[in-house]
């Protein structure tokens, strides 16, 4: 979910054409989750092949990524590794929410409430090993690079942007700012009706407007609540900023409120400010493997062959074996 920083950021509208020629790191879990949630049948169930395997994520990756490549926008997917131990409670809460949504989905389905059934079905979405494995296989066949993070995918994606190996992170979560991404892109959707909502958030601009350092932004996040701590009841982002402006640090702000942290703040600072990232990664766009793509998508997963060939042609037209130096 990330930190609720929507009210304190001032995003700039950006046109899709401004992303042409740029490498973008993509928070794979975030994006694949959206594909699984949104690409569903009328009864709320995900898209499946004739053998019952879920294919919503493959559909999204293949057709949306090929369209990005056609527009000369170069995505690099970054996959989550092992979550920090401090995230365990957040993960358990999400599991409970999904269980409750599953219950409400079945109830809505039983009474024939299609709208409610679809809404609650989307909330049951989860990523399993098979979905991640098939996503990586598809990207390999498409010639699209991906990086396996050690821990948080957002941290790795943000690090790659901070090193100027990519221009921006594509994610809905504001955690990228705490992780040090110099730029993040929100609402990257390919339909014309949604393209007007495309947003660019600059870390430098955000910190300047808020009169905060990145370290202080992390302190504000902890006051509000992160994936690693609950935060202080009643403290939103704006109030958190006022407290940090007044007291300078999280510890002094907590003391003024007569509050304490349930976890060591230094551990959370370490996650955001010095994340465990992969330094030796390769960004290389290759030509798609047409015959293997057709076998995988059309043969194994019953995709429409004509539509799949069209997507492959988009990839072939824009990609050739090339190293990172060639793209920049």
From Swiss-Prot:
It is an enzyme of class 3 (hydrolase). Pfam families: XPG_I, XPG_N. Residues 116-248 are annotated as: I-domain. SUPFAM superfamilies: 5' to 3' exonuclease, C-terminal subdomain, PIN domain-like. Mg(2+) 1 binds at residues 27, 80, 152, 154. Its EC number is 3.1.-.-. Mg(2+) 2 binds at residues 173, 175, 227. CDD domains: PIN_FEN1. Its cofactor is Mg(2+). The keyword DNA repair applies. The keyword Glycoprotein does not apply. SMART domains: 53EXOc, HhH2, XPGI, XPGN. GO terms for molecular function: 5'-3' exonuclease activity; 5'-flap endonuclease activity; DNA binding; magnesium ion binding. GO terms for biological process: DNA repair; DNA replication, removal of RNA primer. Keywords: DNA damage, DNA repair, DNA replication, Endonuclease, Exonuclease, Hydrolase, Magnesium, Metal-binding, Nuclease. InterPro entries: 5-3_exonuclease (IPR002421), 5-3_exonuclease_C_sf (IPR036279), Flap_endonuc (IPR023426), Flap_endonuc_arc (IPR019973), HhH2 (IPR008918), PIN-like_dom_sf (IPR029060), XPG-I_dom (IPR006086), XPG/Rad2 (IPR006084). Binds 2 magnesium ions per subunit. They probably participate in the reaction catalyzed by the enzyme. May bind an additional third magnesium ion after substrate binding. Residues 320-328 are annotated as: Interaction with PCNA. Residues 1-98 are annotated as: N-domain. Structure-specific nuclease with 5'-flap endonuclease and 5'-3' exonuclease activities involved in DNA replication and repair. During DNA replication, cleaves the 5'-overhanging flap structure that is generated by displacement synthesis when DNA polymerase encounters the 5'-end of a downstream Okazaki fragment. Binds the unpaired 3'-DNA end and kinks the DNA to facilitate 5' cleavage specificity. Cleaves one nucleotide into the double-stranded DNA from the junction in flap DNA, leaving a nick for ligation. Also involved in the base excision repair (BER) pathway. Interacts with PCNA. PCNA stimulates the nuclease activity without altering cleavage specificity. Belongs to the XPG/RAD2 endonuclease family. FEN1 subfamily. This is Flap endonuclease 1.
């Amino acid at each position: 979910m990330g930190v609720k920083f929507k009210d304190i950021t001032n995003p700039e509208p950006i046109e899709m054409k401004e992303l042409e020629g740029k490498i973008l790191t993509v928070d794979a879990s975030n994006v694949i989750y959206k594909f699984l949630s949104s690409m569903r049948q009328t009864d709320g169930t995900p898209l499946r092949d004739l053998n019952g395997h879920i294919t919503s994520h493959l559909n999204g990756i293949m057709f949306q990524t090929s369209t990005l490549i056609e527009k000369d926008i170069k995505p690099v997917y970054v996959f989550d590794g092992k979550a920090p131990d401090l995230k365990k409670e957040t993960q358990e809460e999400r599991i409970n929410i999904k269980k409750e949504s599953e219950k409400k989905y079945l109830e809505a389905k039983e009474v024939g409430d299609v709208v409610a059934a679809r809404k609650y079905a989307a909330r049951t979405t989860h990523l399993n090993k098979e979905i991640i494995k098939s996503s990586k296989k598809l990207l390999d066949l498409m010639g699209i690079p991906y990086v396996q993070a050690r821990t948080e995918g957002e941290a790795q994606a943000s690090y790659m942007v901070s090193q100027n190996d990519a221009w921006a992170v594509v994610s809905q979560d504001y955690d990228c700012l705490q992780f040090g991404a110099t730029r993040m892109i929100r609402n990257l959707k390919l339909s014309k009706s949604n393209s007007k909502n495309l947003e660019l958030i600059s870390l430098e601009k955000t910190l300047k407007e808020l009169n905060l350092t990145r370290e202080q932004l992390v302190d504000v996040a902890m006051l509000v609540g992160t994936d690693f701590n609950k935060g202080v009841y009643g403290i939103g982002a704006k109030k958190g900023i006022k407290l940090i402006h007044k007291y300078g640090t999280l510890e002094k702000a907590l003391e003024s409120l007569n509050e304490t942290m349930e976890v060591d703040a230094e551990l959370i600072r370490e996650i955001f400010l010095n994340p465990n990232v992969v330094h030796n990664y390769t960004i290389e766009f290759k030509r798609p493997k047409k015959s293997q793509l057709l076998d995988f998508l059309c043969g194994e997963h019953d995709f429409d062959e004509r539509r799949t060939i069209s997507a492959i042609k988009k990839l072939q037209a824009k990609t050739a074996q090339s190293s990172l130096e060639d793209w920049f």
